[in-house]
Amino acid sequence: MASKESKPSRTTWRDMEPPLRETWNQVLQELVKRQQQEEEEQQGLVSGKKKSWVSIDLLGTEGKDIKKVNIWEPCEKWFAQVVWGVLWVLQIVLWGCLMWEVRKGNQCQAEEVIALVSDPGGFQRVQHVETVPVTCVTKNFTQWGCQPEGAYPDPELEYRNISREILEEVYKQDWPWNTYHWPLWQMENMRQWMKENEKEYKERTNKTKEDIDDLVAGRIRGRFCVPYPYALLRCEEWCWYPESINQETGHAEKIKINCTKAKAVSCTEKMPLAAVQRVYWEKEDEESMKFLNIKACNISLRCQDEGKSPGGCVQGYPIPKGAEIIPEAMKYLRGKKSRYGGIKDKNGELKLPLSVRVWVRMANLSGWVNGTPPYWSARINGSTGINGTRWYGVGTLHHLGYNISSNPEGGICNFTGELWIGGDRFPYYYKPSWNCSQNWTGHPVWHVFRYLDMTEHMTSRCIQRPKRHNITVGNGTITGNCSVTNWDGCNCTRSGNHLYNSTSGGLLVIICRQNSTITGIMGTNTNWTTMWNIYQNCSRCNNSSLDRTGSGTLGTVNNLKCSLPHRNESNKWTCKSQRDSYIAGRDFWGKVKAKYSCESNLGGLDSMMHQQMLLQRYQVIRVRAYTYGVVEMPQSYMEERGENRRSRRNLQRKKRGIGLVIVLAIMAIIAAAGAGLGVANAVQQSYTRTAVQSLANATAAQQEVLEASYAMVQHIAKGIRILEARVARVEALVDMMVYQELDCWHYQHYCVTSTRSEVANYVNWTRFKDNCTWQQWEEEIEQHEGNLSLLLREAALQVHIAQRDARRIPDAWKAIQEAFNWSSWFSWLKYIPWIIMGIVGLMCFRILMCVISMCLQAYKQVKQIRYTQVTVVIEAPVELEEKQKRNGDGTNGCASLEHERRTSHRSFIQIWRATWWAWKTSPWRHNWRTMPYITLLPILVIWQWMEENGWNGENQHKKKKERVDCQDREQMPTLENDYVEL
């Protein structure tokens, strides 16, 4: 009874019931009803006062003309019409600009901006992806240890677009490769599961069929999801372009990926969670695999010209050089040899970073014949190479424990008795539910290939590397000027491997086929002189040359022991042509054993590598969620970056007191205008904040209810599983006792039997040891029920409080309207246009006065330029013989002479030249703001000419006499900045 009294009641009162969801028609009817009530009221809340708020006429029922104050009454009618027209034109221009911006496809839409953190893109790029927690989401979550579907949003329905500008600013047109640990963890679980049950699998027969077949075959599909504060950027459009072209060899050091369109999601696409090595994948993965066939960007590349490079550019995903497929932290997953086809290091393993760029794409098998590439029957002596490519995996392939033919229509299927996971093999027998001998046409296949010379940006054709004794001097067969970066500058007239001395000083090997087609160029910075000195130092090569002899298609040198030099295994120079001595584009002087420049593989990938490739279209980012309050905008948007966005700093003049008075007056007007709305806004914010907080509390309470319900459901499920286990136990015991297969007794929950051991091991008695009793389970259910009832009541109360607070918001406005006389408070608002017009007029008058003041100041400064007219008296030479002169004695060596001061008036052209020179040397000429003052120069010239020559040009200067002695002439100061007239 005590438990029943303490048990909370499940009944709720009527106000706790959540309101039904209103439809749009109900909302519209309520608005119309309120409008009609407002129309019936002839007066406001205060008697005798008009309503001060604005009502919206939705249905057009308000037809009465309300007398309004015309703010343009004092103005002239034409002035009002002009202003009205200008406003309309401005509005049309603004709308046109808005529509033009919206129609631009590469602009950032409003819903595409993520302003979450203080960085340009609204997110932070996560480089160490191994530190990011991840979980899987699948349908059979209880069986495979994943989260249920719906725990994370569907990426196809809920996503956020990222603009192209943000992608370029964050990733710098470089979508990097990431070695995700999530597929490695799945691979580790599969390996651990196989090792723990390896002994049991060896004893199985062909009658064994388990649900684990779906996991092995990759039919358990799910998504990888990252929790908050992480997210995934899913690329929707991308292309590749070369970077860091080696000027010596011509190969591209890097192939970068430029993603131009991406979405922010929480989960990846669906993919098989775990599987073993296979060849043909499910058709559900075709679109995802096809997306990795990345095309070249629309830039000027030689491979894009079909005439120069048949077949176009390479398509696929370039795994960069230096990538680690299995990092050092998980090196125990590496096998002795690579099981990933062409994805291998220089030693054929995965212990070192990749030394050559590896391309992975979905294979196009439309041109194949019987599971073999085109022209496969034309290969020489049954080799695996054709058209410069060595093929691996053509013939029989390993697919889910079976050897099947590479021909999808062949239907060949042989069981091997083992599964391949990474670099290890595990014996395992199972009877698959799928038909192994079916027609696999239409199922996607991975194609792994490597361009060893890495010149994908020049051509997609693979060539067979030339032997050194087949490299000869061209002798006129090569014309033009070309290099390793410019293959189109030369022309060839004969097939062969021509040694060419380029104009840049290095050596080139131009590979010419079909008499006129250049299929490749290999180069080095070593010049001809250095090479020839090495050649002459070779034994018995003093009288030899590299001239072409023989009648073969490619030609050869005369002496095979005196071919193009190279370094042997001891790093010493030699000229002997060996059987496996080829020349490579990236190793001109080394001994290269690889005959073909390309390597291709079909299949050979397990689920780990399959997931790794599909995950390359995703990048992990770090974000933060929106919160209540003000959202902090990114700092980069607040600061103007770059020289083009920086405003020029100018020295400010002293502000007079009138400016401060005007500023204070404007601030007072603005403060008065916002005083009335400030009180109402404060009250509304207070009630709104309370309502939002109540809604948040209600949401939190409902979240607790959901968590308690989920815990209760889990507990119920646990009880059901216990019940199922016990029933299964009883059924097993009954069956065994009926058929007399078991004769045992129990002792402390353990079974002691004298029958066959395999029968006793079939019943795992220890799994039922720690099961709880039904009384304990009932008590826990009762506790869950009581907790859930309390939480439901608390949630209902919080919802009721939130609804009450939300209904109080309009009541606050009515209370304020009843308390204050709003109509009289805002009666002065009708004079605001006049005040604004007055302020604008004062500002315009002030600007005009400033312009006039500047013009007057400039006029005075230019007008003050004067030219001093001086008379230079040339003294007569001194008579040393003391001869007596006619006009004086000359006893002191100087004479008193009288000269007429002759002055000539300057012409208009002279005045103009002097004025123009003064303008050119003044600082006003270098400032664009003072350039308009140049229009005043003609007026100044005319004014000065009139002052000098008079209004009629008849001013006469009187002749003056001036006595100048020697002392005065010697002590005359130097004239500076004056024009001297002789």
UniProtKB/Swiss-Prot annotation:
For this UniProt record, the keywords arranged alphabetically read as follows: Cleavage on pair of basic residues, Coiled coil, Disulfide bond, Glycoprotein, Host cell membrane, Host membrane, Host-virus interaction, Lipoprotein, Membrane, Palmitate, Signal, Transmembrane, Transmembrane helix, Viral attachment to host cell, Viral envelope protein, Virion, Virus entry into host cell
- Ranges for region Fusion peptide: 657-677
Q: Which domain of life is it from?
A: Viruses
GO aspect biological process, one term: virion attachment to host cell
Q: Which residues form a coiled coil?
A: 689-738, 779-814
Please identify the protein, giving its name as recorded. Envelope glycoprotein gp160
* Gene Ontology cellular component annotations, sorted alphabetically: host cell plasma membrane; membrane; viral envelope; virion membrane
* Signal peptide range in chain numbering: 1-106
Chain ranges passing through the membrane: 832-852
Query: What quaternary structure, including any partners, is listed in this protein's UniProt entry?
Result: The mature envelope protein (Env) consists of a trimer of SU-TM heterodimers attached by noncovalent interactions or by a labile interchain disulfide bond.
- Using the UniProt annotation, give the residues that carry a glycan (glycosylation sites): 140, 161, 206, 258, 298, 364, 381, 387, 403, 414, 435, 439, 470, 475, 481, 491, 501, 515, 527, 537, 542-543, 568, 697, 764, 771, 787, 821
Residues annotated as region Immunosuppression?
A: 723-738
Extracellular face residues: 107-831
- List residues in topological domain: Cytoplasmic: 853-982
**What this chain does, per the record?**
The surface protein (SU) attaches the virus to the host cell by binding to its receptor. This interaction triggers the refolding of the transmembrane protein (TM) and is thought to activate its fusogenic potential by unmasking its fusion peptide. Fusion occurs at the host cell plasma membrane.
User: Lipidation annotated as S-palmitoyl cysteine: which positions?
Assistant: C855
Residues of the site described as Cleavage:
R656, G657
Question: What does the entry report about post-translational modification of this chain?
Answer: Specific enzymatic cleavages in vivo yield mature proteins. Envelope glycoproteins are synthesized as an inactive precursor that is N-glycosylated and processed likely by host cell furin or by a furin-like protease in the Golgi to yield the mature SU and TM proteins. The cleavage site between SU and TM requires the minimal sequence [KR]-X-[KR]-R.
